[in-house]
Design a protein with these regions (language model features):
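Aromatic sugar-binding surface patches on proteins
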Residues: 548-568
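Membrane-interface micro-motifs in multi-pass membrane enzymes
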Residues: 36, 62, 112-160, 178-183, ...
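Short, aromatic- and glycine-rich surface loops/edge beta-strands on solvent-exposed regions
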Residues: 529, 573-584
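Transmembrane alpha-helix segments characteristic
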Residues: 17, 116-122, 208-215, 302-331
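Hydrophobic transmembrane alpha-helices
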Residues: 73, 95, 99-103, 149-158, ...
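Extracytoplasmic catalytic-loop and juxtamembrane helix elements of membrane-embedded
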Residues: 30-48, 135-139, 219-254, 310, ...
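Membrane-interface alpha helices of multi-pass inner-membrane proteins
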Residues: 164-179, 186-195
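Intrinsically disordered, polar/acidic, low-complexity terminal segments
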Residues: 6-60, 69, 73-120, 192-194, ...
Length: 605
């Protein structure tokens, strides 16, 4: 009875994390180019596709995932949707390969395998990793790195005499290494696993040669490395490096604890108790990993359990990945210590704990008291991780809306202070955006920028129809165009009449019963608007955040406003009366919403 209850609980937890993780990654995925990809675009517009692929960006070789990005530019106008789907598919691939090792294991029973399955799913689909998994470009890089590493773990067992498999493993190591800088951690991981699996010396030497070839190839890729940050990191002080390592490893625990306390992470991490928790938790995890690793290195008896291969591989690989992060960012960590706990590093540190739990589950299977201890700790860890997982549902959706608003400013050719949601360097946006506009890529693919300056009668062949458009809007801030001309930010509320089809209402009825939110006839906000002057000339466009009332009620508990929109007016003249029309479904609304001039007060919308 206890076994069945344990299996049921583990299966329910795994399903809950899997379903919610996938749903909220899809709904919260970043819709526009952001962060480092502005640098890649800037390089791409002045070089060939091959030069773009082999170039190192921020000391990362992105050779293999760059082909995903180049394909998106070539065939999908730079849309983020293909990258989001590829990243999610690679995330599934990583989890599937690890689960293959779990269920191929012959040393554990069904109950422990189900618990291990729960651990793998939570480790991969925990929304604490949303800083990577909700950004298609980053997810495709990092998940390809992990998927290649997981493939190595699957193939490495019992292949010491199969040279074809050895070559495939080395090839997967190259894919991991040249997908993301942290992927170079695969080589010490492979060497250690090969030793513990009692590989013959020719196979170990072959992996060692692959390691040297990968390092030399990396050094030869442009731009050539001149600062040798690994050596600089080694000279920065052992105690400092160990402290950074402990904090990075413990960051999932710290984020989960902050979610339970209800305090924001940037405030919680500054508390002395939190700093102590980070150091000691990381130290305990590393000591446990070290004890397990030393035991396996001495005994060289790893080949009996594929589950332990997966766990030990994850532990060693992600410790190596974190050490590479420290080596590359050591100077930045000195200047800004809080950067050590940046959420993007949770992608790696969470998998360290996943691997540690997998090893513990395998080792506890045949211990008298260890079995139930491991089960209780695994279930407790999953419950402990849930609040952060839950809170990130809302955080990543809010981030998506902020990115869409910043992209609206770029479409209108306006310089606003929300540009940092796209890039920390606004000047880079100013350099790259004209090229994106010229090639109709990314946020310019829909052609909204072409409407500005046209007469409204020339849009959609002059088609208009009653939409029952209602709302209000006002000028919230005066800004500037990219050419220095005056501009204005417009924020508002707008709705049009919309009836939910009966078939759709029937289909979602079971979900609405669960969440307690009835879907009724009501209004929706159009996705696009035009802002016109008295002569009928379009002076700017506006967009709403892509969140329907149904999705908001069912998946976000109605917490987000679904009627807001944001836009800009180019060449703004406060003496002119502007109006807003909806421009959804290739038709303009007959109704208009007047723009109120209230730049001195921010509207509460």
């Amino acid at each position: 009875m206890a076994k069945r209850a344990t299996q049921a609980c583990a299966a329910i937890f795994a399903l809950a994390f899997l379903v919610t993780g996938v749903v909220y990654v899809l709904f919260g995925s970043c819709p526009a180019t952001n962060a480092d990809f502005w640098s890649i675009y800037e390089f791409y517009f002045s070089h060939s596709w091959w030069q773009t692929a082999v170039q190192k960006y921020a000391d990362h070789s992105l050779f293999f995932p760059n082909f995903f990005w180049l394909a998106s530019v070539k065939f999908f106008h730079g849309s983020q949707v293909p990258l989001n789907l590829i990243g999610l598919a690679l995330l599934f691939t990583t989890a599937a390969l690890l689960l293959l090792l779990v269920w191929r294991d012959e040393t554990t029973g069904r109950t422990m395998k189900i618990v291990a399955t729960m651990v793998v799913i939570v480790g991969n689909f925990w929304m604490g990793r949303e800083a990577i998994t909700c950004f298609g470009g980053f997810n495709s890089e990092n998940s390809l790195t992990m998927a290649a590493a997981a493939l190595c773990f699957v193939l490495i067992r019992g292949t010491s005499r199969l040279w074809l498999m050895i070559l495939i493993i080395i090839g997967a190591g190259f894919v991991s290494s040249f997908s993301c800088g942290q992927g170079f951690a695969i080589w010490p991981t492979l060497l250690l696993l090969a030793w513990c699996l009692r590989f013959r010396w020719p196979a170990i030497v072959a992996i060692g040669v692959g390691t040297l070839v990968a390092i030399i190839t990396y050094q030869l890729l442009p731009p050539l490395s001149e600062d040798y940050r690994v050596i600089q990191a080694a000279n920065s002080g052992g105690i400092t490096l160990v402290a950074h390592l402990c904090r990075l490893i413990s960051s999932p625990v710290l984020y989960a604890a902050a979610a339970w306390t209800g305090i924001r992470m940037n405030e919680y991490s500054s508390v002395n108790q939190a700093s102590t928790l980070a150091l000691w938790t990381g130290a305990v995890g590393l000591v446990l990993a070290g004890v397990i690793l030393i035991r396996r290195v001495v005994r060289r008896d790893l080949g009996k359990s594929s589950l332990e291969i997966a766990g030990l591989g994850l532990v060693v690989f992600n410790v190596g990945a974190v050490m590479l992060i420290i080596a590359g960012r050591i100077q930045y960590f000195h200047m800004l210590p809080s950067e050590v706990l940046a959420p993007r590093y949770l992608f790696w540190s969470s998998l360290f704990w996943t691997g540690l739990f997998l090893v513990a589950i395998q080792r506890a299977e045949h211990q008298r008291w260890g079995r139930w201890t491991a089960i209780v700790f695994a279930l407790a860890a999953v419950i402990f991780a849930w609040p952060e997982h839950y809170l990130m549902w809302f955080h990543n959706k809010l981030s998506k809306c902020r990115v869409e608003q910043a992209a609206t400013a770029v479409i209108n050719g306006v310089v606003d202070d929300n540009s940092w949601f796209l890039s920390l360097d606004p000047r880079q946006i100013g350099r790259v955006a004209p090229q994106l506009r010229a090639h109709r890529l990314d946020m310019f693919a829909d052609g909204l920028q072409d409407w500005i300056g046209l007469n409204e009668t020339s849009l959609f062949r002059g088609r208009r129809k009653p939409e029952d458009l209602r709302g209000k809007c006002r000028v919230s801030k005066l800004v500037e165009c990219d050419n220095g001309a005056p501009a204005a930010r417009v924020v508002g509320l707008a709705t049009t009449r919309h009836h939910v089809p009966r078939v759709v209402r029937w289909a979602i009825a079971p979900v609405t019963w669960i969440v307690g939110k009835e879907i009724k006839k009501g209004y929706v906000t159009p996705a696009r608007f035009v802002i016109v002057d008295p002569t009928g000339v379009v002076r700017g466009v506006a967009r709403s955040c892509s969140l329907t009332p149904i999705v908001n009620r069912v998946f976000y508990q109605g917490r987000f406003p679904t009627t807001d929109f944001l836009g800009y007016i180019r060449d703004y003249n406060p003496q002119v009366q502007y109006v807003v029309r909806s421009a959804a479904d290739d038709v303009l609304s007959e109704e208009t919403i007047p723009v109120q001039d209230d730049a001195s007060n921010n509207p509460q919308l």
